[in-house]
Amino acid sequence: MLKLYDVEVGSRLLLGTARYPSPAVLAEAVRRAKTEIVTVSLRREAAGGKAGGAFFELIRELGVRVLPNTAGCHSVQEAVLTAKLARDVFRTDWIKLEVIGHHDTLQPDVFGLVEAARILSGEGFQVFPYTTDDLVVAEKLLDAGCRVLMPWCAPIGSAMGPVNPMALRAFRAHFPDVPLIVDAGVGRPSHAAAVMEYGYDAVLLNTAVAGAGDPAAMAEAFALAIDAGRIAHSAVPLEPRDMAVPSTPVIGKAVFS
């Protein structure tokens, strides 16, 4: 089981709810993934009027836990206000905190992120911060009250997969007891399996499923890959070697003279 703050969940796949072809496709993807947590943008759905109300009803029917986010926020003030509105709407202290600092890369504004995390933690929120793989920033987020960290593996929506495996491995090694969720940049199930093999606790993704030719099938593929990566990590895979090592023992080999 994965423990996030005071909640235990069985699935290690967190699924975003944006950009699906239809509500029916989203619902089927959630079911096939067997996810227990979905992320929701309050700003996007609130702007949808009646459609937003239908969306919220669909989420309730699926019986999953909602992790609201502050997607699209570019300032501390904006992110804090959105988080407070989300708490009122969804009646949860959970918030996926995003403070975007760069329009092209959608890279987090790590200075604003830490400040917003400190404010929200002080007001009783349980913060899931979308951050980079910078260890110093991560330490400051923990000092600000975060008990979960969500480093990216590549820019949002890029589908590039882990662009800096060494940094992700170092992040895991530096925070062995902190729940770590890879967020952003995952494009294929093999990417998800790879980060789980590094020892990460979960993967959050959206575009890789919503933008697939068959989102429901892709959601299931990701769920299987995440499970496989987790099992592989627990099984302690072999480390790469520079030289060949024979897999067949030579004991008992016939000797010809």
From Swiss-Prot:
It comes from Rhizobium etli (strain ATCC 51251 / DSM 11541 / JCM 21823 / NBRC 15573 / CFN 42). 1-deoxy-D-xylulose 5-phosphate binds at residues 157, 184-185, 206-207. It comes from the Bacteria. GO terms for cellular component: cytoplasm. It is found in: Cytoplasm. GO terms for molecular function: thiazole synthase activity. Belongs to the ThiG family. Catalyzes the rearrangement of 1-deoxy-D-xylulose 5-phosphate (DXP) to produce the thiazole phosphate moiety of thiamine. Sulfur is provided by the thiocarboxylate moiety of the carrier protein ThiS. In vitro, sulfur can be provided by H(2)S. The keyword Transferase applies. Signal peptide: none annotated. Keywords: Cytoplasm, Plasmid, Schiff base, Thiamine biosynthesis, Transferase. The active site is at residue 96. Homotetramer. Forms heterodimers with either ThiH or ThiS. Its main location: cytoplasm. Its EC number is 2.8.1.10. The keyword Cell inner membrane does not apply. This is Thiazole synthase. PANTHER family: THIAZOLE SYNTHASE. It catalyses: [ThiS sulfur-carrier protein]-C-terminal-Gly-aminoethanethioate + 2-iminoacetate + 1-deoxy-D-xylulose 5-phosphate = [ThiS sulfur-carrier protein]-C-terminal Gly-Gly + 2-[(2R,5Z)-2-carboxy-4-methylthiazol-5(2H)-ylidene]ethyl phosphate + 2 H2O + H(+).
